[in-house]
Design a protein with these regions (language model features):
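A polyampholytic, Gly/Pro-enriched intrinsically disordered region
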Residues: 54-55, 100-111
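Short, well-structured alpha-helical segments in soluble
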Residues: 43-51
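Short, charged, surface-exposed secondary-structure boundary motifs
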Residues: 89-96
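N-terminal basic/disordered segments at the start of proteins
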Residues: 1-17
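Hydrophobic faces of well-ordered beta-strands that scaffold small-molecule active sites
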Residues: 5-7, 31, 58-59, 81-83
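Glycine-rich phosphate-binding "P-loop"
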Residues: 22-39
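Amphipathic, hydrophobic secondary-structure cores in small proteins
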Residues: 51-63
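Alpha-helix-loop-beta-strand connector modules within alpha/beta enzyme cores
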Residues: 65-86
């Protein structure tokens, strides 16, 4: 039996059905999925746990503590949920890039 894990990341233009892949060996099966928001994240996690028997969920640094808790509650105590956070300097670099890339452009901002 292979160990099954999913890595989830956020992007404002994500479509989980389209933006994902699976990497598989005889001992490890890794699902990678990009989601638009927390609602999609919860639904994707619940679906993969039910349909694929996921053992571990790894979340990108953009997930908040509340997001992590909500996902952990949704998938149950038999699934590990962790966040890929680095040290202080690494986290700041990641946060700055996400702010620059994901912030609405002036032309995209609501009137």
């Amino acid at each position: 039996m292979a160990f099954k894990a999913v890595f989830l990341a956020h992007a404002p233009d994500a479509e989980p059905e389209k933006h994902g892949c699976v990497i598989e060996t005889s001992k490890y099966k890794l699902f990678v999925v990009v989601v638009k928001d927390q609602d999609q994240a919860v639904e994707v996690c619940k679906k993969l746990v039910k349909e694929e028997g996921i053992h571990s969920i790894l979340l990108c640094p953009g997930f908040t503590h509340r997001d992590v808790a909500e996902i952990a509650e949704a998938v149950g105590e038999n699934v590990a949920v962790a966040v890929a956070r680095g040290d202080g300097p690494s986290s700041r670099v990641s946060m700055q890039v996400r702010k620059e890339q994901f912030a609405p452009k002036p032309s995209e901002a609501a009137c």
